[in-house]
Amino acid sequence: MTNRRLFVAALALAAAVLAGAGALRAQTIQRGLYVSALTDAGAPIPDLGPADFVVREDNMAREVLKVEPAIEAMQIAVLVDTSQAARDQIAHVRTALPAFVKTLTTGEVRNEVAIIAIGERPTVFTNYTFSQAELQKGIDRIWSVQGSGTYLLDGIIETSQGFKKRGAGRPVIVALLSEGPELSNRQHDQVLEPLRAGHVAFHVITMGHPSSSLSEEARERNRVLDEAPRATGGRREELLTSMALGAKLTQLADELTHQYKVTYAHPPSLIPPERVTVAAARPGVTARGTLIKEDKGRP
């Protein structure tokens, strides 16, 4: 009789454990990231699945549930340095941008692109549209402004605020910069916070020899250029000459149009994670991710 009672008790305990596990699975929240998976040469890698990615929340591994092509439309703000220091790069910028915006706006996915100048003060040349003709009008307005400096940090903040007002679901900033003086009077955390809060992927390409300025504005800008791409799943490229810009923009457009949507399991919790990261599960692959807007953790 004693053995029978022990057996029944063991069955009851096992059933309770299974029921609890089932309830926990039922309560699991699905969260997602837009992820770039690239070779060492920067080319997108096709046909990846859940086993190819490792997602962590505050260094705790989470189960990857699903991996699929990201087909949601992007809202892409191209911030162009039109300061006096960008004068020698402007011709290459004007030449490289048409193919970039064509790739982003061609096809079934209706990505919207805006052209925004950040020399002198942030100015919208072409608002968000998938019309290549309208975007070309904005590109044609790109010229350096005599006597002006760069207002990158102001431009990032204002663009992030604009994404919020528009309810952008997949916002992206691509900044094309000279190494001229930064004139925004901003702290780096004032810039990073709206990027994180808005789930904005920030990519930046700088052209020219690195600046040796020790001004406070230069230090704050350098911190943003260092931290923002890593914090938001973007990329940072440093070109000594703007002649290479066309190839880099082609590579970036290829990356943006071949991202994955990675869905993972987040356990029920009253406290959102401070940091969400994604990595490749095998060598030779680089993975970068941007947390999808409806999620509350920080990428």
Task: Tell where the protein language model's regions lie, with residue ranges.
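Scaffold/interface architecture of coatomer-like assemblies
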Residues: 24-299
